[in-house]
From Swiss-Prot:
This is Trk system potassium uptake protein TrkA. The RCK N-terminal domain binds NAD and possibly other effectors. This is expected to cause a conformation change that regulates potassium transport. NAD(+) binds at residues 7-11, 30, 73-74, 98. It comes from the Bacteria.
Length: 223
């Protein structure tokens, strides 16, 4: 996959290096050309000097072929504008933006842009939002038989209760991250757009659970 990153600070450079190591092609945009030194001499991706929400700059970075876009510059407004341009003008499927003001998170979330306050951001968290495939194990019991994992959830689960998700997938939802905050859901909690679902499940059932989460809820007769 080709991935475009706006911002070559600590998170942006770490993200670019991690993605390249995973076999993705990467382009990094920054208005300060000296910031590219953080990438190191071994980085083989594109270095594009410019403003990350400028359409010509984005095209130079290969946004038209990109499967993901990360806005991790030092400015909230620049990040959200760039994220919206990537999604709305270029149709990039996986988009995430870093913000510094957590009070803005809900507004951005309504725009369909995953955001989390910067104190919680790490390159690893951004990686999971850009490449939402498969379960990310966060904890395993000593025997290795049970694990806690963040599982990518199909958007078709939005609007359905946690109880239905648990019943159809056979997992227990441990907690949900919503607008950057962890919540302990009840069986009546309804999944919202942008929720990150963390579940307890048997390690030998990971692939089955991933498939059920990706498939979405079963069709209901007469529903």
């Amino acid at each position: 996959m080709h991935i475009v990153i706006m911002g070559c600070g600590r998170v942006g450079s770490a993200l670019a290096q991690a993605l390249e190591q995973q076999g993705h092609t990467v382009a990094v945009i920054d208005r300060d050309p000296t910031s590219f030194r953080r990438l190191g001499s071994s980085f083989g991706g594109r270095r594009v000097t410019g403003i990350g929400f400028d359409q010509d700059t984005l095209r130079e970075a290969g946004i038209e072929e990109a499967g993901a876009f990360a806005a991790v510059s030092s400015g909230d407004n620049s990040n959200i504008i760039a994220a919206r341009v990537a999604r709305e003008m270029f149709g990039v499927e996986n988009v995430a933006a870093r913000i510094y003001d957590p009070r803005r998170a809900e507004v951005y979330q309504r725009l369909g842009i995953p955001t989390v306050a910067t104190v919680r951001w790490t390159a690893d968290q951004m990686l999971r939002r850009l490449l939402p495939s498969g379960a990310e194990p966060l904890w395993r019991d000593p025997t290795g038989g049970v694990q806690l994992a963040e599982v990518h959830t199909s958007s078709s689960w939005v609007g359905h209760k946690i109880s239905r998700l648990q019943e159809e997938t056979g997992v227990r939802v441990a907690f949900v991250t919503r607008l950057g905050e962890a919540i302990l859901p009840s069986s009546q909690t309804v999944l919202q757009e942008g929720d990150l679902v963390h579940v307890m499940m048997r390690t030998d059932e990971v692939h089955k659970v991933e498939a059920a989460f990706a498939k979405g809820p079963e069709e209901e007769g007469g529903h």
